[in-house]
C-alpha cells in the first residue's frame, strides 16, 4: 500500500503539471478533459486489450488509495467545503519568484485613518517605511504610553523621560482607589521596572488567588523584578534640580518625542528641559545577540539659542545608580562600587529562592562631544540599598554637549550554565560582559542592529492594502521576538514566557496556556527553534506534572493552570477542579511541533518528548472521566472551560472535545511508534459527551442557559485550533455554534477571542467576508497607541469592564493576531493522515485559501518553515500560491473540498421548538462534480523544491442577493460600543453587528461602494437583530464624473509631489485630466437641507478617504463643487419590529438562533431632483451615510444603541 500511495502522489503531481496554464482564473476545467485521448486503431487487437487493462488497473489503484485516504485519521478534521463555480484543482509549475502583490495607494492611504480608531492615537505617529512608532505627548507615567526594550532574556519598561524607574501616576478614566494597580493575582502598583527571564520567587500568599486553601500545601511562584538597570540621573546647581522620572514635571518639558524602532528594538527619547535651555536625548537597547547586555546612551546638551544673556557655564552631576528599591519581591544579597573601573554592582535573590540570584554590574563612559578622553567618576556613593557613581561635568557654549554610554552586564543563575565553575560566578560574568563592552558603543550598536535584521530575514508579512493591519502584524512579530530567544536556552529547562513577557509583572509573570496555544504557534512557522524552546519548558516540568497526578490519586500527569519556577499545584494554579484543558493545550503544542517538522524533529522527538506528554494526559483523562450509564456516554465534572465566567461546571465543551481529540492523537501516535495503546482511549474518544441543545447548538457546558455572556472564545476553539470537526454533521453544528456564540461574547472580553473567530469564519463560511471583519475586531478595540501594544481588554476602565485591571502588554493577543493571518486567512493547517495498513502517520500541510474582498491585493507570508523547508504563501486577489523556495525535500499538500459547507441552511426559532423559520436568504448553491483524483475531502499534491502550487481562491458568495454594499469599505462617523467595528455591518454575516455607544445621539456609518459605481440604490433592508432602532435615514453624495476622476488620481499625485512647487505644477495637470476648470462652480446642493449635517458628512468623508483631497481643496478654494452636500434619499423612516418578542426563549432558557428584526425600504427618486432636470446619473453614488436614531424600546435599562447586523442595498 505504501508503494501505491507513493505512485498516487506522483501521478497527481504529474497530472497537475499538465495543467500549467499561467492563470487559473479563466480556466474552464471539468476535471476530465485533460485525460481524454484520441486513440488510433491498431491491427493487433490484443495490444488494445492490454492497454485498456493497464488503464483499468491504474484507475483501480487510484480508487483504492482514495478509499483508504477517506478512512484515515487527521489532526485537523475539517472535511470539506463545496463552492459554486469553484475549481479546486491546482497547478504545479516551476517557481516564478517573489510574487509581488499589487499595491493600491488609495486603499493604503485610507487604511491609515484606522489608526485614529485606536485608543490614545491623537498624539501618536507611525513611520511605515522605517517601522518606527512614537508619540509627541509628554504625559504623566502610565503603562499604556510606555515602550520597552527586551531581547528574550532581559527587559525594561521605559518611563516618560526615557530611562530610570517610575511608578504609574495616571489613570485615564478614574482616580478611584486601586486605579493605578495591576490585576490578578498581584494587584500591586504598576511600575516601569526591569525583568530577567525565568527569575521567579516563591510567595506564601498573594493578594488575590482562586483557591486560597492551596496556600497551605505549596507556595505560589511569580516573577521578581530586578533593580532598574536603565537608572541614570543628573542634577544641576548643587543638586537643587534633578532630572529623573520623579522630579521632571509636565511644565518642565517641551519639544518632546519618544519612539520605538521595531526594526532594531531601540527606544529613543528626546526633549527640551527647563525653558528649553537643555536638550536631552537617550537611546536604550537590550543587545539582541549578547543577551546579558543592556545599553543606555544619554546626551545632555545646551540649547544655545535659549540660554540667558549672562550664561557662563552649567555644572552637571551625572549619577549612575543601582537602587534596590526599584526591585520587587527580591532580597538584597550585596551591593557596592568598583572604583577601579568606575562601576557599581548589586546582587539580588528572588524571595524564598536562595539557590538563585541575579547580578547587575554597571559602568559608564562619559565624554564631551568630539573628545576622546573619558571623564572618570569624581565620587562613589553607597548606602544600605543604593550604589552610585557620580560624574561631574561643566557645559559651556564651547563644550555644549556631554555623551554618556552606560554598559550593564546582567547575569542570573538561570542563564549561567557554567555556574558550577568558580570563575564563572554571576557577578564575575556580569562584570566581564560590561567591561568587555565598555568603549565599544558603535560596534555593539552595529552588531545589535544586524542581529535584529537577521531575525527579520526569517519572517515577513505583507498586507499591501492596509497599513494598520500590516503594522499590527509586524509589531506582533516584534513583541513576540523581543520576549523570546533561541540562544542559551537549556533543553532541561526550556523557555518560560509569561503573558506580558519581560516588561511587566501582569499575571505575576506566570506561564499559562497563553504560551502553548497563542504565542508558540505564532512563532512556530517562522522561528521553530524558539517555539521548541517554549515547549521544552513543559517537557522540563513534566516530571512535576506526574507528581501532581500522583498526589490526587490519578495515573499519568496533570499540569497546573499556572506555572513558574515550578509546576506544582498552587492557589493560582490548581491541578484539579479547574481548567483541565491545560493538559490538552500542552499536548497539542508539542504535537504541533512534530507536525511542523523542522530540523531534528522526527520520530525520536515524537517518541521521547511528545509521546510521554500525550500518553500521560490520556492516562489521566481515562481515569478522570466518568461513565453515565443513562446516557451511555462518558462525562466530566467540576471543571472550568476557557470561559472563566462559568466556574465549576460539568461537561465543558472545549474540554470534552479536547479529551476526545487527545485520545485520538494518543492512539495514532502509539500505533505509529509501536507502543502499547490502551483500547479504552478509542472507546472514550468515541463516546465522550459533548452537550448540545435541542437545536443542535453545542452548549458550552451542561445546563447552560440563554442568558449566558461569554468571557472569551470557548466553543469556537473546537474549530480552531483544536480541529475537532470530523464529520459533516459536526461541521454543520459548528456553523451554528459560530453564529450563536458570536452574539454572546462579552463586549469587554479579552483580546484572545476574535482571532479564533477569524480562523473559524474563514474555514466554515462560504458567504460574506466576516473572517476579515473579525480580523479588524481583533485589533481596533485592543491595540494601544503609541507603541502598538495590545491590552488584554477592549475597555481598560476597571469601573466599567467588570473590575478587570488588564494585563499589559498582552502578548497573547500578539500571538492570536498572527495566527489569524498565518492560519486563519490562509487556511493553512498542520495535519496528518494515518496509513490504514501500516498505522504510520504521514504529515501534510492543508491549504484552504479564500478571496479577501476587504484586503485588496491580498497578503503574503514570506519564509514560512515547514518540514525543514522554506515556503512563501501568497494570497492575491485571485489565486493562492505556495512557493517551495528553499530546501531539498518535497512536501505533501492537501486542498480541502468546500462542498459540505451549508452556512445559510439555518432554521430560526419560531416560538416553538418544533417550528423554525428559514434563513433570511437561503437558496440552493450550484455544485460542480468531483474533479479527477480527488477524494471526498480534498485533493492532494506533492510539491517539490523550486516548484509552486497555485490554486484558484474560493470566492465566498453574497449573503444577501444583489447587495451592492456587501464586503465594501465602511467607517463609523460616531462612536461605537467598545469592541465593535463598522465592518461588521457589511460583512455578509447576520450574526455580527455594529452598535452605537449610546441610544441618545444619532449614529452614522459612512459606506464607500468603490470607484465608478454604475448602480443606483432603489431598495434595501436593515437587519437589526433583537434591538432595532427608532428610525433610519440614508443619504448619498451625488455622483459626478469629474469628481470621480479627481478622486481616482489625487492620492498618487499628492504622494509623489515632494514639494510645494512640484505640487502646484501637478495640480493643473490633475484638474485638466479630470476635465475641471478652476473657475468652475457647479451647484450640487439640489435640495434644501434642514441643517448643515450633510455638509459635515462631506468633511468626514474627505477626512476618511481623501485627506489629500481635503488638502487640495485648501490649495484651491474655488473648487466649490467639491463642497456639495449629501442628499437624503430616506428621511427618518420609523422602524417597527418585524419579529415578536420570544419570551419563552428567555423564560425557558432555550438555546436557539432567533430570527432578526428587519426593516425594508424603497427609494422614490421622483421626489428628488439634483442638477439638470432629467439627469439621473447623480443617483449612481459612491458614498452613502446610514444614520440611525435611538432604539425601538426607549425605556429599557440598556444605554447602548441599536444593533446593526447587516445593511443591504439593492439596485
UniProtKB/Swiss-Prot annotation:
Its EC number is 3.2.1.28. GO terms for molecular function: alpha,alpha-trehalase activity; carbohydrate binding. The chain crosses the membrane at residues 47-67. It is found in: Membrane; Vacuole lumen; Periplasm. It is a single-pass type II membrane protein. Residues 70-131 are annotated as: Required for cell surface targeting. Keywords: Glycoprotein, Glycosidase, Hydrolase, Membrane, Periplasm, Signal-anchor, Transmembrane, Transmembrane helix, Ubl conjugation, Vacuole. It catalyses: alpha,alpha-trehalose + H2O = alpha-D-glucose + beta-D-glucose. GO terms for cellular component: cell periphery; cell wall-bounded periplasmic space; fungal-type cell wall; fungal-type vacuole; fungal-type vacuole lumen; membrane. Glycans are attached at residues 98, 207, 238, 247, 255, 259, 325, 370, 376, 488, 539, 568, 628, 638, 696, 705, 879, 897, 910, 972, 990, 1031, 1049, 1064, 1147, 1157. Changing residue 2 to R: Abolishes its ubiquitination. Normal protein targeting to vacuolar lumen. The keyword ATP-binding does not apply. One of its GO terms (biological process) is carbon utilization. The active site is at residue 644. Its main location: membrane. InterPro entries: 6-hairpin_glycosidase_sf, 6hp_glycosidase-like_sf, Gal_mutarotase_sf_dom, Glyco_hydro_65_C, Glyco_hydro_65_M, Glyco_hydro_65_N, Glyco_hydro_65_N_sf. The keyword Manganese does not apply. Substrate binds at residues 513-514, 711-712. Residues 68-1211 are periplasmic. It comes from the Eukaryota. Changing residue 37 to R: Abolishes its ubiquitination. Normal protein targeting to vacuolar lumen. Belongs to the glycosyl hydrolase 65 family. This is Periplasmic acid trehalase ATH1. It comes from Saccharomyces cerevisiae (strain ATCC 204508 / S288c). The gene is ATH1.
Amino acid at each position: 500500500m505504501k508503494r501505491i500511495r507513493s505512485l498516487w502522489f506522483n501521478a497527481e503531481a504529474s497530472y497537475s503539471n499538465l495543467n500549467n496554464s499561467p492563470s487559473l482564473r479563466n480556466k474552464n476545467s471539468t476535471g476530465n478533459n485533460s485525460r481524454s485521448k484520441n486513440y488510433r486503431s491498431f491491427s493487433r487487437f490484443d495490444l488494445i486489450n492490454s492497454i485498456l487493462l493497464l488503464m483499468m488497473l491504474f484507475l483501480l489503484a487510484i480508487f483504492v488509495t482514495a478509499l483508504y485516504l477517506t478512512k484515515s485519521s487527521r489532526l485537523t478534521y475539517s472535511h470539506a467545503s463545496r463552492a459554486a463555480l469553484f475549481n479546486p484543482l491546482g497547478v504545479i509549475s516551476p517557481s516564478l519568484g517573489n510574487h509581488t502583490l499589487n499595491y493600491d495607494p488609495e486603499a493604503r492611504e485610507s487604511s491609515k485613518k484606522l489608526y485614529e480608531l485606536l485608543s490614545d492615537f491623537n498624539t501618536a505617529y507611525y513611520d511605515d517605511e522605517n517601522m518606527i512608532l512614537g508619540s509627541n505627548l509628554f504625559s504623566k507615567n502610565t503603562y499604556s504610553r510606555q515602550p520597552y526594550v527586551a531581547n528574550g532574556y532581559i527587559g525594561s519598561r521605559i518611563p516618560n523621560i526615557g530611562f530610570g524607574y517610575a511608578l504609574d501616576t495616571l489613570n485615564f478614566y478614574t482616580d478611584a482607589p486601586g486605579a493605578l494597580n495591576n490585576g490578578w493575582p498581584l494587584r500591586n502598583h504598576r511600575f516601569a521596572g526591569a525583568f530577567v527571564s525565568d527569575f521567579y520567587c516563591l510567595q506564601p500568599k498573594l493578594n488575590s488567588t482562586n483557591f486560597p486553601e492551596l496556600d497551605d500545601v505549596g507556595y505560589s511562584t511569580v516573577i521578581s523584578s530586578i533593580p532598574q538597570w536603565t537608572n541614570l540621573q543628573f542634577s544641576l546647581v548643587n543638586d537643587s534640580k534633578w532630572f529623573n522620572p520623579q522630579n521632571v514635571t509636565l511644565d518642565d518639558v517641551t519639544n518632546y518625542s519618544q519612539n520605538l524602532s521595531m526594526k532594531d528594538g531601540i527606544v529613543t527619547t528626546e526633549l527640551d528641559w527647563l525653558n528649553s535651555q537643555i536638550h536631552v536625548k537617550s537611546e536604550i537597547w537590550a543587545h539582541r545577540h549578547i543577551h546579558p547586555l543592556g545599553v543606555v546612551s544619554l546626551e545632555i546638551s545646551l540649547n544655545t539659542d535659549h540660554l540667558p544673556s549672562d550664561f557662563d557655564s552649567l555644572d552637571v552631576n551625572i549619577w549612575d545608580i543601582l537602587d534596590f528599591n526599584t526591585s520587587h519581591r527580591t532580597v538584597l544579597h550585596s551591593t557596592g562600587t568598583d572604583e577601579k573601573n568606575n562601576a557599581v554592582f548589586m546582587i539580588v535573590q528572588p524571595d524564598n529562592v536562595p539557590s538563585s540570584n541575579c547580578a547587575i554590574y554597571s559602568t559608564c563612559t562619559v565624554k564631551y562631544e568630539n573628545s576622546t578622553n573619558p571623564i572618570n567618576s569624581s565620587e562613589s556613593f553607597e548606602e544600605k540599598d543604593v550604589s552610585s557613581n557620580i560624574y561631574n561635568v561643566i557645559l559651556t557654549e564651547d563644550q555644549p554637549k556631554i555623551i554618556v554610554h552606560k554598559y550593564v552586564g546582567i547575569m542570573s543563575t538561570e542563564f549561567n550554565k557554567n555556574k558550577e565553575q568558580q570563575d564563572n560566578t554571576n557577578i564575575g560574568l556580569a562584570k566581564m560582559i560590561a567591561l568587555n563592552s565598555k568603549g565599544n558603543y558603535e560596534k555593539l550598536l552595529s552588531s545589535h542592529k544586524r542581529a535584529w535584521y537577521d531575525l527579520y530575514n526569517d519572517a515577513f508579512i505583507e498586507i499591501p492594502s492596509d497599513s494598520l493591519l500590516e503594522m499590527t502584524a509586524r509589531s506582533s512579530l516584534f513583541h513576540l521576538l523581543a520576549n523570546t530567544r533561541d540562544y542559551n536556552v537549556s533543553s532541561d529547562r526550556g523557555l518560560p514566557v509569561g503573558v506580558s513577557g519581560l516588561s511587566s509583572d501582569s499575571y505575576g509573570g506566570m506561564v499559562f496556556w497563553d504560551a502553548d496555544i497563542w504565542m508558540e504557534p505564532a512563532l512556530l512557522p517562522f522561528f521553530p527553534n524558539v517555539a521548541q524552546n517554549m515547549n521544552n519548558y513543559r517537557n522540563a516540568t513534566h516530571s512535576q506534572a506526574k507528581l501532581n497526578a500522583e498526589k490526587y490519586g490519578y495515573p499519568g500527569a496533570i499540569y497546573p493552570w499556572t506555572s513558574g519556577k515550578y509546576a506544582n499545584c498552587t492557589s493560582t494554579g490548581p491541578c484539579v477542579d479547574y481548567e483541565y484543558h491545560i493538559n490538552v493545550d500542552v499536548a497539542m503544542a508539542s504535537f504541533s511541533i512534530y507536525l511542523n517538522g523542522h530540523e531534528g524533529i522526527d520520530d525520536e522527538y515524537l517518541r521521547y518528548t511528545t509521546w510521554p506528554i500525550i500518553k500521560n494526559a490520556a492516562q489521566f483523562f481515562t481515569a478522570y472521566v466518568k461513565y453515565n450509564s443513562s446516557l451511555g456516554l462518558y462525562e466530566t465534572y467540576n471543571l472550568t472551560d476557557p470561559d472563566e465566567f462559568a466556574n465549576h461546571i460539568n461537561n465543558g465543551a472545549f474540554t470534552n472535545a479536547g479529551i476526545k481529540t487527545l485520545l485520538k492523537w494518543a492512539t495514532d501516535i502509539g500505533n505509529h511508534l509501536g507502543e502499547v495503546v490502551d483500547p479504552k482511549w478509542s472507546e472514550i474518544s468515541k463516546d465522550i459527551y459533548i452537550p448540545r441543545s435541542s437545536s443542535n447548538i453545542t452548549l458550552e457546558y451542561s445546563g447552560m442557559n440563554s442568558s449566558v455572556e461569554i468571557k472569551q472564545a470557548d466553543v469556537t476553539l473546537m474549530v480552531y485550533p483544536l480541529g475537532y470537526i470530523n464529520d459533516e454533521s459536526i461541521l454543520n453544528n459548528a456553523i451554528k455554534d459560530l453564529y450563536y456564540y458570536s452574539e454572546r461574547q462579552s463586549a469587554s472580553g479579552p483580546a484572545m477571542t476574535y482571532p479564533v473567530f477569524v480562523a473559524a469564519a474563514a474555514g466554515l463560511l462560504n458567504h460574506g467576508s466576516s473572517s476579515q471583519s473579525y480580523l479588524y475586531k481583533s485589533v481596533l478595540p485592543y491595540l494601544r497607541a503609541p507603541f502598538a501594544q495590545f491590552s488584554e481588554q477592549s475597555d481598560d476602565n476597571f469601573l466599567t469592564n467588570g473590575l478587570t485591571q488588564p494585563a499589559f502588554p498582552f502578548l497573547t493577543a500578539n500571538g492570536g493576531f498572527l495566527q489569524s493571518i498565518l492560519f486563519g486567512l490562509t487556511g493553512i493547517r498542520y495535519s496528518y493522515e494515518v496509513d490504514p495498513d501500516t498505522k504510520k502517520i504521514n504529515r501534510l500541510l492543508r491549504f484552504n485559501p479564500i478571496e479577501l474582498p476587504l484586503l485588496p491585493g491580498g497578503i503574503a507570508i514570506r519564509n514560512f518553515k515547514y518540514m525543514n523547508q522554506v515556503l512563501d504563501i501568497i494570497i492575491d486577489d485571485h489565486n493562492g500560491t505556495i512557493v517551495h523556495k528553499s530546501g531539498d525535500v518535497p512536501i505533501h499538500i492537501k486542498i480541502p473540498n468546500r462542498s459540505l459547507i451549508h452556512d445559510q441552511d439555518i432554521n430560526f426559532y419560531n416560538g416553538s421548538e418544533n417550528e423554525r423559520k428559514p434563513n433570511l436568504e437561503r437558496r440552493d448553491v450550484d455544485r460542480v462534480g468531483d474533479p479527477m483524483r480527488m477524494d471526498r475531502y480534498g485533493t492532494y499534491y506533492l510539491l517539490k523544491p523550486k516548484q509552486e502550487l497555485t490554486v484558484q481562491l474560493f470566492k465566498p458568495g453574497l449573503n444577501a442577493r444583489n447587495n451592492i454594499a456587501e464586503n465594501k469599505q465602511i467607517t463609523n462617523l460616531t462612536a461605537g460600543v467598545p469592541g465593535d467595528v463598522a465592518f461588521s455591518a457589511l460583512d455578509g454575516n447576520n450574526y455580527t453587528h455594529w452598535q452605537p455607544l449610546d441610544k441618545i445621539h444619532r449614529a452614522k456609518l459612512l459606506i464607500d461602494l468603490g470607484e465608478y459605481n454604475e448602480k443606483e440604490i432603489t431598495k434595501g433592508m436593515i437587519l437589526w437583530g433583537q434591538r432595532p432602532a427608532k428610525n433610519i435615514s440614508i443619504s448619498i453624495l451625488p455622483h459626478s464624473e469629474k469628481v470621480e476622476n479627481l478622486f481616482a488620481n489625487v492620492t498618487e499625485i499628492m504622494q509623489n509631489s515632494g514639494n510645494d512647487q512640484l505640487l502646484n505644477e501637478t495640480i493643473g495637470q490633475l484638474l485638466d485630466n479630470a476635465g475641471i476648470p478652476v473657475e468652475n462652480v457647479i451647484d450640487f446642493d439640489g435640495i434644501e437641507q434642514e441643517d448643515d449635517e450633510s455638509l459635515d458628512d462631506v468633511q468626514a468623508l474627505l477626512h476618511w478617504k481623501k485627506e489629500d483631497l481635503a488638502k487640495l481643496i485648501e490649495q484651491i478654494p474655488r473648487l466649490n463643487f467639491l463642497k456639495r452636500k449629501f442628499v437624503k434619499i430616506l428621511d427618518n423612516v420609523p422602524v417597527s419590529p418585524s419579529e415578536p418578542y420570544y419570551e419563552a426563549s428567555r423564560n425557558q432558557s432555550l438555546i436557539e438562533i432567533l430570527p432578526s428584526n428587519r426593516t425594508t425600504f424603497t427609494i422614490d427618486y421622483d421626489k428628488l431632483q439634483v442638477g439638470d432636470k432629467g439627469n439621473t446619473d447623480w443617483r449612481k453614488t459612491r458614498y452613502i451615510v446610514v444614520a440611525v436614531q435611538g432604539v425601538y424600546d426607549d425605556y429599557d435599562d440598556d444605554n447602548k444603541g441599536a444593533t446593526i447586523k447587516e445593511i443591504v442595498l439593492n439596485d
